[in-house]
């Protein structure tokens, strides 16, 4: 970029936030003074990296909120790699006591075929360790430990997705802490549906899976609140309509769009009850669920963790406050605002929040997250024994309430 191009992007970003950010007081931050300060820093910038990651985004992060970033054209796919990638290794990971531990393997995936199992510790991906990723990554708000831990795990998880056919080398420790290496090739995503959700972004994908557990309890997991997945999710709920209870697994679900989260919540409530309030620049806006036929009437438990963000937090927080669902897992990060995207000069992209989410009982989710009714953490030794402690706790709770 030339100096003039950088200046044009900078001014477009500052002005858009100035005019459209949800809070005209900017949370007490002097946005005018912040702009003046970073304009001075801009004058000393002589390369694009410094412009994007030492001036422009740090300026945005002064607001201390999620759902805000400015990205050059070549990085727009990085908004949420798990959402936009076509290929996958079929592995999910979390930071457990400072180790990057495999928490889930998709049957039939490259990771499954290579013998990787839940509980194995990943030391590096293509030579990059957790420490490397932590050093490279830009700290992003909200600045709480849950979000920072989740972001680090999420950055490592993003490396488990890529272009079909590309290879990746994973160094790991097995169940006996013996080192191993697996050379894996990204394969088409299992159980994923893909489609366009925003003209400014590439096609998005979400995995949808459901089954009946041994006790007849329904289990539904979907990896995003995305339009391409909505029909599959609603059909899964219909398939499980006679299950006495249903576990909806939103662990690791980074979010999606309002119509999708509202449609799924409506399928579980069926009455025009309050859903989410939005504090907008123009005032408070109330939203309501739709009265729909064929509502699922059984008990609902929702699984969440530090990577359940945005739409996952709205959906969960709303159903919790309405008394429709019991929440199990670990506290969500509080990365929960509604965002718009705006194209910038040179095909860059600005993401910014235009509304603050509140549950029907008035809880602000941004920065606070959803606190589970039953708090349970994953444990490596249990994973090695084939036990998902959070899922087990949900099943035990439902079996107890059925008595």
Task: Describe each PLM feature range.
Residues 82-132, 226-227, 355-356:
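PDZ/PDZ-like domain segments forming the peptide/carboxylate-binding groove
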Residues 374-403:
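Low-complexity, Gly/Ser/Thr/Pro-rich intrinsically disordered linker/tail segments
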Residues 2-26:
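Mature N-terminal segment immediately following signal peptide/propeptide cleavage
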Residues 25-98, 163-169, 173-207, 395, ...:
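Extended, small/polar residue-biased N-terminal targeting/export presequences
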Residues 162-345, 383, 397-399:
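Cleft-lining beta-strand/loop regions that shape enzyme active-site pockets
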Residues 111-147, 220, 247-249, 319-322, ...:
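Conserved PDZ fold ligand-binding element
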Residues 44, 118-169, 260, 335-336, ...:
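PDZ domains, with a preference for the canonical peptide-binding region formed by the helix
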Residues 13, 104, 216-224, 353:
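Active-site-proximal beta-strand elements of phosphoester/diester hydrolases
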